[in-house]
A protein has these predicted regions:
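A short, conserved, highly charged catalytic patch centered on acidic carboxylates
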Residues: 1-48, 57-86
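Carbohydrate-associated surface elements
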Residues: 54
Length: 86
């Protein structure tokens, strides 16, 4: 089931490359919350995901084929995201 993303960033060709999921500040971004969001967003086929509650932020690079993800140390810049390379 596909739903509207909170924020969806596109590359220069209009392809989606980053989804940002925004939670309320009082919602803690636990491993369970993050896992639910990343699994849900595999349906978009987007290589990057950010989850934030406005206080805490997590970024990940997804591997759609393997249905896995790698947490990143920081949110990548736009040029990195559109290269679609690790």
């Amino acid at each position: 089931m596909l739903r509207r993303a909170d924020i969806l960033v596109h590359d220069r060709d209009g392809e989606p490359v980053l989804i940002v999921e925004c939670k309320a500040p009082q919602v803690k971004i636990t491993q369970e919350v993050f896992d639910q969001i990343i699994n849900y967003n595999f349906s978009y086929g987007v290589p990057y995901l950010v989850v934030t509650n406005g206080i805490t932020h997590f970024a990940a690079r997804t591997d759609i084929a393997k249905r896995s993800f790698e947490l990143l140390d920081s949110i990548p810049d736009y040029e990195t995201i559109i290269r679609r390379e690790p």
